[in-house]
Regions:
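Amphipathic, hydrophobic secondary-structure cores in small proteins
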Residues: 5, 9-63
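Short, solvent-exposed charged binding patches
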Residues: 60-76
Length: 76
C-alpha cells in the first residue's frame, strides 16, 4: 500500500505525516486504547524522538514497540 498523508496538530502547530494505511489503523487503535487523540499521542512521540528520526519513523517505531510489549505480556 502507498503511504497516506494526514495532518496532525502538535502543540498548536500543523504538520503532515505520511504512513501506510496499516500504520494509520494501528496508530488510531493505540490512541483509542489509551483514551487519547492522535494529536496528543503524536505530540508525545514527537517530544521523545531524537533529531535523527523523522516523525513518521518515530510513530512506526512506537507502534512496533507497543505491539511487541503487548505480545510479550501475553506470552508470560
Amino acid at each position: 500500500m502507498r503511504p497516506e498523508k494526514h495532518s496532525l496538530t502538535l502543540r498548536g502547530h500543523r504538520t503532515s505525516v505520511s504512513l501506510e494505511p496499516e500504520f494509520w489503523q494501528a496508530f488510531r487503535a493505540l490512541a483509542a486504547a489509551e483514551g487519547r487523540g492522535l494529536n496528543e499521542l503524536a505530540a508525545e512521540i514527537d517530544a521523545g524522538r531524537g533529531a535523527e528520526r523523522g516523525l513518521a519513523s518515530a510513530i512506526r517505531v512506537h507502534i512496533l514497540e507497543r505491539l511487541t510489549r503487548a505480545r510479550d505480556a501475553v506470552g508470560r
